[in-house]
C-alpha cells in the first residue's frame, strides 16, 4: 500500500472492506478490496476464487482487476474505480429507471451473464450492488467471491450463497444440485426492482422468503416440496397453496408487456423451465424497433473511449490455485497506466536482466583476449533474440480497436465476418480472450528467460574491468614477491635502510594500484586489498614481517628521523658531555636511550 494514497472507504462487508485510493505516481484512482485476516479458510478461499476467475475471464462488462498483492497477511485486490452502482441509480430514481436506460443496462448485464454461463461459470450473487455503472453508461458485473465453475453430474455446491432477497427457491431449501438458473432468478428479481424502484422479495429469514415466493411467484414443485418437508429447519411449517394467473402481464401489472414476459420467464419455480441468458438476448424486448442495431454503435464508441483511459494489459501467469497470493508486493496484474508503457517497461527489465547475466559471465571467465570474441558473439545473439521477441509480442484485446463486425451481432458469433478465430465458449457476446502468455511484459518478467542483451558500452566496460583487474593482480604478485624476500639484520643502520626501501616499494605499489582512470575508480573500491590478500596467503614469518613494516611505517613520519636513530648511543653521550660538562657531572649522565 506504500504506492497508494487512501482517500476513503467505499464499502464494507462480512469478508473485507473496499477503499478508494490514488496511485502516487500516476494519480489514477483505484478501488482496493482488502480481505479481513481471519483464522478460518473461508476468506482465503473466497479471495482465491475471485482472483482465479478475474484472471481467467475478461469481458467489457466485467470489472477489470489491475493487480493483487499481500501485505500484513491481508490479500489486496486492486480494481478499476467505478463509484456508481445500480443501487445508487435506484436511490436517485425512486420510482425506477426510465425505459431506455433500463433496456441499455439490462442488455449489457445479460451479455456479462451469458459470457459467464457459456464458460460454465455461475456468479451466484447477482444484485444491484454488484452492478457497477461507469460515467459513460457501461455496466460491469463485479464481486466474484461466490462465483464458481459449474459442477459435474453428482457434485454438490455450497448451500449458503447469494443475498437472501435474490435467492432462488432451490437455494433457500439448500438443494445442492443447483446450476445456472439461480443467476436467472436473481436477474428476474433485479429487473422488477430496477423497473419499479422497490425490491420484489424483501425478507428477514428463509421462511419469510419462501412464504413470499409462494404468495407472489408460485407453489413449490414436488421435488422442492419434498426437500421442504424433510428439512428440520422448516419442521411443522405448512406453506399456503395459491392460484396465480398464467398470463405474465396480469401477474406483473406494474411492468410493460415485453418486460413482464421476460420477468415471467426468469421467475419460474422449476429451474428447468427458466429461460437461458442467450434466449433472453433474443427476446423481442431487445430485438424490436432495431434496438440492437442502434445501440451497438453507441456501445462501441463508449468502449473505445474507455479503452483510451483504461487500456489494461493481460495479467502475469504467476498465480497458483494452491497459493493464492505470494507474500510480496509484486503485482499479479499490471496496468500500463500505473507502471508505464508495457512494451518499454518489458524492454528495460529485459535489458537489466541481460546485463546482470553478462556481468556474471565476465566474472566467471578466465583469461583476457580469448574471451572477447565470445562476448561479441553473445551480443549479436542477444540482438537477434530481442528482434524476435519484439516480433512475437501481440497487442491485447483492449489495445486494439474493436471491429464493427465484432459489435454488430453480439448474439451470434458465427455471423461475424472477422477473420479472427473466436472462443468457442464465448457465447456470441463481445468478449476479451482468455489470458495467455503472449504479452510483452510477461516475456520480460519471465525468470526462466536466458536471453543476453549486452550493448557496446557494456562490452567496453567489461574489457576495461578485465584489464584493470589483471593489472591489480600483477601488481599484487610483484609486491608479494618483493615483500617476501629474505631479510638479514647485520647492523641497526643497514636493517633500517632495508626496511625503508621496502616501505618505498609498498608505497610505490599502492601508488601504481591507485593510478587508475576515473572510470575504473568507480568500479573498484578496495585500497587495502593488497594487505588483505597477502595476509591470507602468507604464513609464518611473512605475516610477522608485514606487521613490523606497518608498525615501523607509522613511527617513521619524516625522512629526518632515520639519521637520528642511526647514530651510535655512546657517541651521542660523548657529544652531550662535551657540550654540557657541568650538567653531566651532577649525575645526569645515565638518561634513557
From Swiss-Prot:
Bias type Low complexity, positions: 436-452
Reaction equations catalysed: L-seryl-[protein] + ATP = O-phospho-L-seryl-[protein] + ADP + H(+); L-threonyl-[protein] + ATP = O-phospho-L-threonyl-[protein] + ADP + H(+)
GO cellular component, one term: nucleus
Pfam families: Pkinase (PF00069)
Sequence ranges of Basic and acidic residues compositional bias: 368-403
Residues annotated with Phosphotyrosine modification: 160
Tissue-specific expression: Highly expressed in brain, and to a lower extent in heart and testis.
Domain (Protein kinase): residue spans on this chain: 4-286
Binding site for ATP: 10-18, 33
Active site per UniProt: 125
Sites bearing Phosphothreonine, chain numbering: 158
EC number: 2.7.11.22
Keywords: ATP-binding, Cytoplasm, Kinase, Nucleotide-binding, Nucleus, Phosphoprotein, Serine/threonine-protein kinase, Transferase
Domain notes: The [NKR]KIAxRE motif seems to be a cyclin-binding region.
Family the UniProt entry places it in: Belongs to the protein kinase superfamily. CMGC Ser/Thr protein kinase family. CDC2/CDKX subfamily.
Entry protein name: Cyclin-dependent kinase-like 3
Lineage: Eukaryota, Metazoa, Chordata, Craniata, Vertebrata
Amino acid at each position: 500500500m506504500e504506492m497508494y494514497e487512501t482517500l476513503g472507504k467505499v464499502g464494507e462487508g462480512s469478508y473485507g472492506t473496499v477503499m478508494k485510493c490514488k496511485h502516487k505516481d500516476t494519480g489514477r484512482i483505484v478501488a482496493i478490496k482488502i480481505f479481513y485476516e481471519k483464522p478460518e479458510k473461508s476468506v482465503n478461499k473466497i479471495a482465491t476464487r475471485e482472483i482465479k476467475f478475474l484472471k481467467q475471464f475478461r469481458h467489457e462488462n466485467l470489472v477489470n482487476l489491475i493487480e493483487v498483492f499481500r501485505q500484513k497477511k491481508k490479500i489486496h485486490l486492486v480494481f478499476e474505480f467505478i463509484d456508481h452502482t445500480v443501487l445508487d441509480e435506484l436511490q436517485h430514481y425512486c420510482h425506477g429507471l426510465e425505459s431506455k436506460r433500463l433496456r441499455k443496462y439490462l442488455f449489457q448485464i445479460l451479455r456479462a451473464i451469458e459470457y459467464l454461463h457459456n464458460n460454465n461459470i455461475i456468479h451466484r450473487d447477482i444484485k444491484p450492488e454488484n452492478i457497477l455503472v461507469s460515467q459513460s453508461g457501461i455496466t460491469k458485473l463485479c464481486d466474484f467471491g461466490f462465483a464458481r465453475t459449474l459442477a459435474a453430474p453428482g457434485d454438490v455446491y455450497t448451500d449458503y450463497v447469494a443475498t437472501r432477497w435474490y435467492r432462488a427457491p432451490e437455494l433457500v431449501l439448500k438443494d445442492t444440485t443447483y446450476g445456472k438458473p439461480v443467476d436467472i432468478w436473481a436477474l428476474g428479481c433485479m429487473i422488477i426492482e430496477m423497473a419499479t424502484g422497490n425490491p420484489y422479495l424483501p425478507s428477514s429469514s428463509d421462511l419469510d422468503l419462501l412464504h413470499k415466493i409462494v404468495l407472489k411467484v408460485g407453489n413449490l414443485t414436488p421435488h422442492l416440496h419434498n426437500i421442504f418437508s424433510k428439512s428440520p429447519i422448516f419442521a411443522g411449517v405448512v406453506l399456503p397453496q395459491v392460484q396465480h394467473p398464467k398470463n405474465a402481464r396480469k401477474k406483473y401489472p406494474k411492468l410493460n408487456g415485453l418486460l413482464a414476459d421476460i420477468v415471467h420467464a426468469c421467475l419460474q419455480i422449476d429451474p428447468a423451465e427458466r429461460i437461458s441468458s442467450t434466449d433472453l438476448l433474443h427476446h423481442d424486448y431487445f430485438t424490436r424497433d432495431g434496438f440492437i442495431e442502434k445501440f451497438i454503435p453507441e456501445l462501441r464508441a463508449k468502449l473505445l473511449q474507455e479503452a483510451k483511459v483504461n487500456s489494461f494489459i493481460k495479467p502475469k501467469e504467476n498465480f497458483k490455485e494452491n497459493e493464492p497470493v505470494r507474500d510480496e508486493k509484486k503485482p499479479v496484474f499490471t496496468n500500463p497506466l500505473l507502471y508505464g508503457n508495457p512494451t518499454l517497461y518489458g524492454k528495460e527489465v529485459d535489458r537489466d536482466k541481460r546485463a546482470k547475466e553478462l556481468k556474471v559471465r565476465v566474472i566467471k571467465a578466465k583469461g583476457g583476449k580469448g574471451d572477447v570474441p565470445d562476448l561479441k558473439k553473445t551480443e549479436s545473439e542477444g540482438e537477434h533474440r530481442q528482434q524476435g521477441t519484439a516480433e512475437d509480442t501481440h497487442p491485447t484485446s483492449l489495445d486494439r480497436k474493436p471491429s464493427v463486425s465484432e459489435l454488430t451481432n453480439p448474439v451470434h458469433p458465427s455471423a461475424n465476418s472477422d477473420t479472427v478465430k473466436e472462443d468457442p465458449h464465448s457465447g456470441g457476446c463481445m468478449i476479451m480472450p482468455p489470458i495467455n502468455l503472449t504479452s510483452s511484459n510477461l516475456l520480460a518478467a519471465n525468470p526462466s528467460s536466458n536471453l543476453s542483451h549486452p550493448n557496446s558500452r557494456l562490452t567496453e566496460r567489461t574489457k576495461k574491468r578485465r584489464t584493470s583487474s589483471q593489472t591489480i593482480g600483477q601488481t599484487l604478485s610483484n609486491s608479494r614477491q618483493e615483500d617476501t624476500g629474505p631479510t638479514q639484520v647485520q647492523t641497526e643502520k643497514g636493517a633500517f635502510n632495508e626496511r625503508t626501501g621496502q616501505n618505498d616499494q609498498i608505497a610505490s605499489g599502492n601508488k601504481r594500484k591507485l593510478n587508475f582512470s576515473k572510470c575504473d575508480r568507480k568500479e573498484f573500491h578496495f585500497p587495502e586489498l593488497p594487505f588483505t590478500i597477502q595476509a591470507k596467503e602468507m604464513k609464518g614469518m611473512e605475516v610477522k614481517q608485514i606487521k613490523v613494516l606497518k608498525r615501523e611505517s607509522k613511527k617513521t613520519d619524516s625522512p629526518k628521523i632515520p639519521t637520528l636513530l642511526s647514530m651510535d648511543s655512546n657517541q651521542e653521550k660523548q657529544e652531550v658531555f662535551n657540550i654540557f660538562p657541568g650538567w653531566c657531572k651532577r649525575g645526569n649522565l645515565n638518561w634513557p636511550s
